[in-house]
UniProtKB/Swiss-Prot annotation:
Activated by autophosphorylation on Ser-219. The modification Phosphoserine is found at S219, S369, S456, S460. It comes from Mus musculus (Mouse). Disulfide bonds: none annotated. Residues 316-357, 511-530 are annotated as: Disordered. This is Dual specificity testis-specific protein kinase 2. Residues 316-327 have a biased composition (Basic and acidic residues). The lineage of its organism: Eukaryota, Metazoa, Chordata, Craniata, Vertebrata. It is found in: Nucleus. The gene is Tesk2. Its cofactor is Mg(2+); Mn(2+). ATP binds at I64, G65, S66, G67, F68, F69, S70, E71, V72, K87. Dual specificity protein kinase activity catalyzing autophosphorylation and phosphorylation of exogenous substrates on both serine/threonine and tyrosine residues. Phosphorylates cofilin at 'Ser-3'. May play an important role in spermatogenesis.
Length: 570
C-alpha cells in the first residue's frame, strides 16, 4: 500500500509529505521555526485537525479485549474500509496518561512499536486509533496449542528487544512491559512482535544529576525488584520485565509465581526454573538469567540483548536440525501427533492442585526434545549477588512474594500515576535519527502537523458503553523546534513531525511549556472561557497558533467551526 495513503482516512484531506510544501521551503537553525504564508498555515490547520479527528459513528466496532484502564475494539472505517484498533479509555483518572500515550506514540516510528493512526472523539473524550494487530498478544500465543519452534520464539524475543532498544534510544523507558503488552502479528513471513501500551512510559532519569524518585508503577509480576521496593530505578527495570517475558517464552507458562518460580526478594528462582526449560538453547537461557539479575547494573542493555539474540538466531537452524535428527528414532506412538506441542507433561509436583487460575489447564509447554529428557549441552549459571535459592534438601514450598505484601494484592493489580512534567516535555524533545536512516523509520511516513492546541473538541452521538474488565510514529519533518505550547482543559497538543536523520546525529531539542499536567489534562481548575466537551453533536473547536505572524480565518465544516487567529506583527 502507498505509504501516503496508509494512515489517511476517507473523507478527510490527504496527508502532506513535507512541511515545506505548505511553508515555502524548510530549514531552520534549530532554535527558530520558519513561518510561511498565512494561507498555508491556515490550510495546514484544517488538514491537521480533520485528517486526524474522527467520530465514533464513523466506524463499525467489534470488541476484542478489555482491562484495567481501557477497552479495545477492532474498528472498520465505514467510508474507506480501513481496519484499525480503537483503545477507549474507561477510567477518568487515567485520562492524562492516555493523552500522553497518544502524544508519545505519534512521535515514534519503528516496525516493532505499535503505530499510531489518529484520534476518535466520543462524548468529549479522545480515544486512540492504532494499527490493528491480527494475532492478539504474546500471552495468548504462548497459552495456545500452536507449535512454536525455538526459531520463532527467539525471533519474537528479538523483535521485542529491538523495539525497546529504539524506545530507550529515544530517552524513554516503558515501565509496564508485559506479555500482554507485546502484540503478535502474523503474515506471510511468519510471526512478529510489536510493543504497545505506553501510558506509563517515562523519561529515562539522568544519572549525572539528582532527580526526584520515580513512582511505583506497572504490573507487579513483571516489575523489577528495585521498583517493588520503592527504590530509585531507571531503564534497567524494563530489562528485568523483559527477562520475565523470556521466561514465559521459554517455558510457555504464566508470569504468576504460582507457575513461574520466584524468590522471596522478588527475583527469579534460577535453580527451579532450569528444570522447566526443556531443550532451550543454553545461550538463550543464559541471556534470560542475565536479564533477570537482581542487580540492575549487571543487566545488559537492549542494544546488547539484540546483538546476542541475532547471534543465537544465526545458529538456531543448524542446532534444531541436529536435535531433530537425534530425536527422530525415538519419537513413537501418540507423541508423534503433537510434536513440540503444548501441554504434554503435567507439573504435578511443581503446581498446587488448586490453581489460582482455573480457566487454564495446568500443563507445562515443552518442545519435542524435552519430552525425551534432552538437557541443555552445558550448565547455565548467573552471577547474582542477591539470589536466595530455596533449600531443596528440606523441600521448601514454592514462594509467592506478592502474596506476602498486602499492597500488591497478590499481584492482581496495576499501579499507575499521573504523567510527570519531564515525560510530557520529552514528547517534544525526542531526537531525530540522522539522514539516510531507513531501518527505524520504515514503518510509516509522517503526517504534517502544526504546533497547535485543541479545545472543546466535537463530540459524537452517544454510544452504549459496555462495562468490562483489559487487553491490553512518527518522525518529524521540520528542521527546527516548534514554538512553545500551552493547553487548556481537555486540551490535546498535536505533535509536530520532525525530519528523519541518522541515529548517531545529535539534534537540537524541541521545547514546550511544562505546565501542570493535572490542569492541562483536565484534573485542575478549568480556565475561564474554556468549554467542556459533553458529547454535543456540534461544538466549537478552536485552533490557536502561537507564532509571530498570524492571520484570522474561519471555516465551517459539517457544523464544526474551526478558527485560526492571526495577525501580522508590525
Amino acid at each position: 500500500m502507498d505509504r501516503s495513503k496508509r494512515n489517511s482516512i476517507a473523507g478527510f484531506p490527504p496527508r502532506v509529505e513535507r512541511l515545506e510544501e505548505f511553508e515555502g521551503g524548510g530549514g531552520g537553525d534549530g532554535n527558530t521555526v520558519q513561518v510561511g504564508r498565512v494561507s498555508s498555515s491556515s490550510y495546514r490547520a484544517i488538514i491537521s485537525a480533520f485528517s486526524r479527528l474522527t467520530s465514533l459513528d464513523d466506524f463499525t466496532r467489534e470488541k476484542i479485549g478489555s482491562g484495567f484502564f481501557s477497552e479495545v475494539f477492532k474498528v472498520r472505517h465505514r467510508a474507506s474500509g480501513q481496519v484499525m484498533a480503537l483503545k477507549m479509555n474507561t477510567l477518568s483518572s487515567n485520562r492524562a496518561n492516555l493523552l500522553k500515550e497518544m502524544q508519545l506514540m505519534n512521535r515514534l516510528s519503528h516496525p516493532n512499536i505499535l503505530r499510531f493512526m489518529g484520534v476518535c472523539v466520543h462524548q468529549g473524550q479522545l480515544h486512540a486509533l492504532t494499527e490493528y494487530i491480527n494475532s492478539g498478544n504474546l500471552e495468548q500465543l504462548l497459552d495456545s496449542d500452536l507449535y512454536l519452534p525455538w526459531t520463532v520464539r527467539v525471533k519474537l524475543a528479538y523483535d521485542i528487544a529491538v523495539g525497546l532498544s529504539y524506545l530507550h534510544f529515544k530517552g524513554i523507558f516503558h515501565r509496564d512491559l508485559t506479555s500482554k503488552n507485546c502484540l503478535i502479528k502474523r503474515d506471510e513471513n511468519g510471526y512478529s512482535a510489536v510493543v504497545a501500551d505506553f501510558g506509563l512510559a517515562e523519561k529515562i532519569p539522568d544519572a549525572s544529576i539528582g532527580r526526584e524518585k520515580l513512582a511505583v508503577v506497572g504490573s507487579p509480576f513483571w516489575m523489577a525488584p528495585e521498583v517493588l521496593r520503592d527504590e530509585p530505578y531507571n531503564e534497567k527495570a524494563d530489562v528485568f520485565s523483559y527477562g520475565i517475558i523470556l521466561c514465559e517464552i521459554i517455558a510457555r507458562i504464566q508470569a504468576d509465581p504460582d507457575y513461574l518460580p520466584r524468590t522471596e526478594n522478588f527475583g527469579l528462582d534460577y535453580d527451579a526454573f532450569q528444570n522447566m526449560v526443556g531443550d532451550c538453547p543454553s545461550d538463550f537461557l543464559q541471556l534470560t538469567f542475565n536479564c533477570c539479575n537482581m542487580d540492575p547494573k549487571l543487566r545488559p542493555s537492549f542494544e546488547e540483548i539484540g546483538k546476542t539474540l541475532k547471534e543465537i538466531m544465526s545458529r538456531l537452524p543448524e542446532e534444531e536440525l541436529e536435535r531433530d535428527r537425534k530425536l527422530q528414532p525415538t519419537a513413537k506412538g501418540p507423541l508423534e501427533k503433537v510434536p513440540g506441542g503444548k501441554r504434554l507433561s503435567s507439573l504435578d509436583d511443581k503446581i498446587p492442585h488448586k490453581s489460582p487460575r482455573p480457566r487454564r489447564t495446568i500443563w507445562l509447554s515443552r518442545s519435542q526434545s524435552d519430552i525425551f529428557s534432552h538437557k541443555p549441552p552445558r550448565t547455565v549459571s548467573v552471577l547474582d549477588p542477591y539470589y536466595q535459592p530455596r533449600d531443596g534438601a528440606t523441600h521448601t514450598p514454592k514462594v509467592n512474594p506478592f502474596s506476602a505484601r498486602q499492597d500488591l494484592k497478590g499481584g492482581k493489580v496495576k499501579f499507575f500515576d499521573l504523567p510527570s512534567k519531564s515525560v510530557i516535555s520529552l514528547v517534544f524533545d525526542l531526537d531525530a535519527p540522522g539522514p539516510g536512516s531507513t531501518t527505524l523509520a520504515d514503518c510509516q511516513e509522517p503526517l504534517a502537523m502544526s504546533s497547535r492546541r485543541w479545545r472543546s473538541l466535537p463530540g459524537s452521538p452517544e454510544f452504549l458503553h459496555q462495562a468490562c474488565p483489559f487487553m491490553g510514529c512518527e518522525e518529524s519533518l521540520s528542521d527546527g523546534p516548534p514554538p512553545r505550547l500551552s493547553s487548556l482543559k481537555y486540551g490535546v497538543r498535536e505533535i509536530p513531525p520532525f525530519r528523519t536523520s541518522a541515529l548517531s546525529a545529535a539534534s537540537g531539542h524541541e521545547a514546550m511549556d511544562c505546565s501542570n499536567p493535572q490542569e492541562e489534562n483536565g484534573f485542575g481548575p478549568r480556565l475561564k472561557g474554556t468549554s467542556l466537551c459533553t458529547g454535543a453533536a456540534s461544538e466549537e473547536m478552536e485552533v490557536e497558533e502561537e507564532r509571530p505572524r498570524r492571520a484570522s480565518v474561519y471555516f465551517s465544516i459539517s457544523g464544526i467551526s474551526l478558527q485560526t487567529q492571526a495577525k501580522q506583527d508590525g
